[in-house]
């Protein structure tokens, strides 16, 4: 609706126009929806202007860097938080393939390949994965980072630390979703 108004008239709608168009009783309801869109980085609100709405282009959102999404277990799986905690000003093109988001590692199960507790794991969002790749996997509602080994209807998610046994997933009884592949690590200053 906002884009259509800008295309038709050359300027964004007022809060009152948005409220009327969407059937809200007041402009305050429209303002709350605009704030939600701004939090999701779809629009930018220009303070103090009744028509102070700017639709962000996708490349402008990318310019803010990579989003940090929750935490990922590198040990026992934990429930992932699905909201963006913050953005880091890191060029996604530094990683091959290109990183789509960052996850904070929790645990030491991947330490033997240099993924440490507290690291930021750069992840390329894909479900096209192969055995031997380090993946971010969701088993039921838990998220973990492990090395993939698919054998028929069974998947082994291997740790890179001999103190941890593999996670065995029986695809006939459990749900497994691949969230992406690890494409890099950013070490935080916590280890110094």
Curated annotation (Swiss-Prot):
- The disulfide bonds in this chain are none
Instruction: Point out the annotated site residues (description: Cleavage).
Output: 74-75
**Catalytically driven reaction(s):** Hydrolysis of Ala-|-Gly bond in repressor LexA
Q: Which UniProt keywords apply?
A: Autocatalytic cleavage, DNA damage, DNA repair, DNA replication, DNA-binding, Hydrolase, Repressor, SOS response, Transcription, Transcription regulation
Task: Establish whether keyword RNA-binding is in the entry.
Answer: no
The UniProt entry annotates the active site at 109 (for autocatalytic cleavage activity), 146 (for autocatalytic cleavage activity)
* Chain residues forming the annotated DNA-binding region: 15-35
Q: Which GO terms describe its biological process?
A: DNA repair; DNA replication; negative regulation of DNA-templated transcription; proteolysis; SOS response
Instruction: Give the enzyme's EC designation.
Output: 3.4.21.88
Give a GO molecular function annotation for the protein: serine-type endopeptidase activity
Role, per record: Represses a number of genes involved in the response to DNA damage (SOS response), including recA and lexA. In the presence of single-stranded DNA, RecA interacts with LexA causing an autocatalytic cleavage which disrupts the DNA-binding part of LexA, leading to derepression of the SOS regulon and eventually DNA repair.
Q: Its family?
A: Belongs to the peptidase S24 family.
UniProt subunit comment:
Homodimer.
Give the protein name, as stated in the record.
Answer: LexA repressor
């Amino acid at each position: 609706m906002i884009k259509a108004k800008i295309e038709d008239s050359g300027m964004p709608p007022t809060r009152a126009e948005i409220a009327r168009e969407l059937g809200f009783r007041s402009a305050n309801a429209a303002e709350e929806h605009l704030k939600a869109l701004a939090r999701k980085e779809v629009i930018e609100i220009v303070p103090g202007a009744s028509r102070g709405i700017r639709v962000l282009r996708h490349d402008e959102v990318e310019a803010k860097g990579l989003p940090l999404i929750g935490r990922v277990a590198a040990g026992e799986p934990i429930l992932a938080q699905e909201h963006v905690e913050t953005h880091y000003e890191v060029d996604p093109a530094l990683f091959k393939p290109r990183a789509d988001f960052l996850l904070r590692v929790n645990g030491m199960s991947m330490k033997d390949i240099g993924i440490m507790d507290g690291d930021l794991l750069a992840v390329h969002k894909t479900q096209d994965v192969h055995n031997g790749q380090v993946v971010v996997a969701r088993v039921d509602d838990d998220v973990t980072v492990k090395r993939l080994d698919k054998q028929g209807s069974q998947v082994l998610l291997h740790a890179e630390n001999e103190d941890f046994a593999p996670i065995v997933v029986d695809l006939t009884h459990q749900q497994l979703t691949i969230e992406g592949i690890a494409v890099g690590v950013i070490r935080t200053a916590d280890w110094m």
